[in-house]
């Protein structure tokens, strides 16, 4: 494998589904009835982003987790610009709020997963969640879900707006909340996953702004079919509190073994 796989975008299309924990605080999860929603539809739109092919999740007229939300594969919700950057948007269409998710077709296992965000995310509406994560429909090891998420989970008074998690989040030792300060027009967020730890790090303008390591060996998932995913969705499916559509730009995704 090339020591560094660099992903910068371009367009095509596909479908996938995850679902939410009971209160919706997961970027990926089982469906509301406890069953896993399909990760890729039979006729999936795909995009090319950062050197990878990604499925674009579409729930059609149904609400899927996380949230649950209506996920759209429309070009107004997911697109790649001329500079190769991925745009995810939450839009309001015919009385329905529609969210966005992309799912890489490759699985990488242990290594460093790095996401570069090319837009501010400190001031997202309290009901909006941006998730950078791994997931596998197989429920073993809590779906092998590792998350970096930006959200206030519906609470506009929450001073924190970001978190690192090795699922399940219901164990306080598996999660740390923190605050991404205003003023970062771009930022980079990563985790290094090994059999010994999951080491998270965030930086902006060349400076580290947060780091945290999860070292509980029994809780570290083993690799097995998980893939990187990015989503922009509404907590518990609730409309943005400010009533406005949302857009986030992902500059690139990188993996290094």
PLM segments and residue spans:
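Beta-strand-rich interaction surfaces with strong enrichment in secreted/lumenal proteins
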Residues: 99-106, 174-180, 217-218
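Short, aromatic/His-centered strand-loop micro-motif at the edge of beta-sheets
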Residues: 165-186
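Localized edge beta-strand/strand-to-loop motifs within extracellular or lumenal beta-rich domains
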Residues: 183-199
């Amino acid at each position: 494998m090339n020591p560094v796989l660099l992903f910068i975008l371009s367009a095509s299309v596909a479908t996938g589904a995850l679902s939410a924990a009971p209160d919706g605080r997961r970027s990926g999860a089982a469906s509301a009835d406890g069953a896993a929603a399909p990760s890729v539809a039979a006729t999936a739109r795909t995009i090319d982003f950062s050197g990878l092919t990604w499925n674009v999740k579409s729930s059609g007229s149904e609400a899927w987790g996380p949230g649950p939300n209506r996920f759209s594969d429309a070009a107004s919700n997911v697109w790649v610009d001329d500079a190769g950057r991925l745009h995810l948007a939450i839009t309001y269409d015919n009385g329905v709020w529609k969210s966005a998710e992309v799912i890489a077709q490759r699985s990488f296992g242990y290594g460093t997963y790095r996401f570069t965000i090319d837009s501010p995310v400190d001031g997202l509406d309290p009901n909006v969640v941006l998730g950078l994560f791994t997931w596998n429909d197989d429920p073993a090891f809590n779906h092998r879900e590792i998350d970096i998420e930006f959200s206030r989970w519906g609470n506009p008074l929450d001073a924190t707006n970001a978190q690192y998690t090795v699922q399940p989040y219901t164990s306080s030792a598996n999660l740390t909340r923190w605050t991404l300060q205003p003023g970062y027009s771009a930022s980079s967020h990563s985790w290094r996953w090994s059999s010994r730890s999951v080491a998270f790090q965030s930086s902006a303008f060349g400076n580290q702004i947060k780091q945290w390591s999860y070292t509980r060996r029994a809780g570290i998932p083993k690799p097995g079919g998980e893939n990187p995913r990015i989503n922009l969705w509404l907590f518990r499916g609730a409309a943005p509190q400010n009533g406005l559509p949302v857009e986030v730009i992902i500059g690139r995704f990188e993996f290094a073994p």
